[in-house]
Amino acid sequence: FEAAGYKDAFQVKLLPADADPMDVRYNLVQWVHRSTRGWSYGTSVVDPRTGEILKGKVTLGSLRVRQDYLIAQGLVGDFKTDSSNVEDMMGMSIERLRQLSAHEIGHTLGLPHNYVSSVHDRASVMDYPHMLVELKNGKVDLSNAYDQKIGEYDKWSIIWGYQDFPKGTDEKKALNTIVDQMYGKGLYFLTDQDARPEGSAHPQTHLWDNGVSAVAELKRISEVRKITLANFDERKLRTGTPMSS
């Protein structure tokens, strides 16, 4: 919103203790505890007469963080010789939660998925991001697993959706100009209709991917997988943890 010229237009605060979560005056991020996997959601209450978004509600499940931590543990954990990277593993999990929160809040603001953003250096939080697992000096590295900022595409989306125009402006023409400017920056938009149906499999709309070339990324991630599996043993578990965990 700041990129669109609106300072402090978007703020996050703790819900007052006496507030009703169903109160339409409050946009809500709700934390839900789950013992099994479940989706996170970003939904809106919309005025059917005008399309105006009246209230946004995000639901984030607790199990996601545990799953991401276990993935990180399997990739970089080494409790036999070095347990100091526990904070790094938890940090990666929190980075994923941060990205997911922005993604679901984006939905409440009216933003759809954009699966082509991974081709453009993670240009949108509205993609389905695969953690960027890298190899450094022959070891798995998660320091750049998830982007920690709003993408350039997201800024253009908010500008397009929320910009106020001076009286007398040809709004349709002005909105098309914004799209042209975005395209001029090398940013594009491809969503579910381009990615999910069998007849709409655009080659750059893979879900959960990184990079420009699917073939090059497959070769890169296969090398990561090879090294990860070669080091996947009991060292990944804390002392005293059952193997069945």
Predicted regions and their residues:
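Metzincin-family zinc-dependent endopeptidase catalytic domain
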Residues: 1-108, 131-135, 159
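Catalytic Zn2+-binding segment of zinc metalloproteases
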Residues: 105-120
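Conserved catalytic/binding loops enriched for acidic/polar residues
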Residues: 120-245
